[in-house]
Amino acid sequence: MDKKSARIRRATRARRKLKELGATRLVVHRTPRHIYAQVIAPNGSEVLVAASTVEKAISEQLKYTGNKEAAAAVGKAIAERALEKGVKDVSFDRSGFQYHGRVQALADAAREAGLQF
């Protein structure tokens, strides 16, 4: 089993549990160059809000889009957008990525900006 298939296996297990709970999910995906976040409705088929370092508004503020500062900017942006939509409580879906580094920075920034998980 390679690294990617192991990550996908972990993500599938976590998502199955979150689906049973019927929770609104804050989903994170990372690549070496960018980080993406989406808030997905409990039915799993509707993206309520999204933010990423690909967006011009966020990437213009940053020197580099693949570090913790960029992840924190995305976390703050996703929290502000979710609160505007009326979403306050979410479940954090780390997509099988280790809760460390950029994933943790995004989560901490989202919590500081007002999301609860």
From Swiss-Prot:
Keywords: Ribonucleoprotein, Ribosomal protein, RNA-binding, rRNA-binding. The keyword Ribosomal protein applies. The keyword 4Fe-4S does not apply. GO terms for molecular function: 5S rRNA binding; structural constituent of ribosome. GO terms for biological process: translation. It comes from the Bacteria. Disulfide bonds: none annotated. One of its GO terms (cellular component) is cytosolic large ribosomal subunit. SUPFAM superfamilies: Translational machinery components. NCBIfam families: L18_bact. This is one of the proteins that bind and probably mediate the attachment of the 5S RNA into the large ribosomal subunit, where it forms part of the central protuberance. PANTHER family: 39S RIBOSOMAL PROTEIN L18, MITOCHONDRIAL (PTHR12899), LARGE RIBOSOMAL SUBUNIT PROTEIN UL18M (PTHR12899:SF3). Belongs to the universal ribosomal protein uL18 family. Part of the 50S ribosomal subunit; part of the 5S rRNA/L5/L18/L25 subcomplex. Contacts the 5S and 23S rRNAs. This is Large ribosomal subunit protein uL18. It comes from Edwardsiella ictaluri (strain 93-146).
